[in-house]
A protein has these predicted regions:
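Flexible "arm" and connector segments at domain edges
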Residues: 1-81, 85-125
């Protein structure tokens, strides 16, 4: 499925769950923040794993479907990023915008932006 198809399914899901009728853009933004925090925790967990912990986990796993700590943290991060996308798609719809249009508008602003990396973050000029 492409992004537009998935977005339409997310919007229909939100409609079916009553999110548009019973929530507000600010409450949806709170949900986005909640998902962002969960994603940050998963990425921090991934970053804190040492090679020895990963190796120990892999060596201790059996053939019964156990996954390593690293794979678990990656799965949590993937879930968190997906959940953030869902909340952003719903938020855009709540304010009568299309998330793809929002992304395109943001890209149009940043595509020629100059700046530099400072402490692992891009800082615009």
């Amino acid at each position: 499925m492409n992004y537009e198809q998935l977005s339409a399914l997310v919007i229909q899901w939100g409609e079916d769950k009553g999110i548009f009728a019973k929530s507000t853009p600010l409450r949806q933004l709170d949900k986005t923040q909640e998902e962002l925090n969960e994603t940050k925790e998963a990425l921090e967990k991934l970053a804190s794993l040492t090679n020895q912990e990963i190796l120990d986990d892999v060596l201790l796993s059996d053939d019964f479907g156990n996954i390593s700590l690293e794979e678990d943290a990656l799965a949590e991060a993937k879930d968190g990023i997906g959940d953030m996308l869902v909340t952003i798609i719903l938020l855009a719809k709540m304010v009568n915008m299309d998330s793809v249009d929002c992304l395109e508008a943001a890209y149009d602003v940043i595509k020629k932006r100059t700046g530099k990396m400072v402490d692992g973050q891009f800082v615009k000029d």
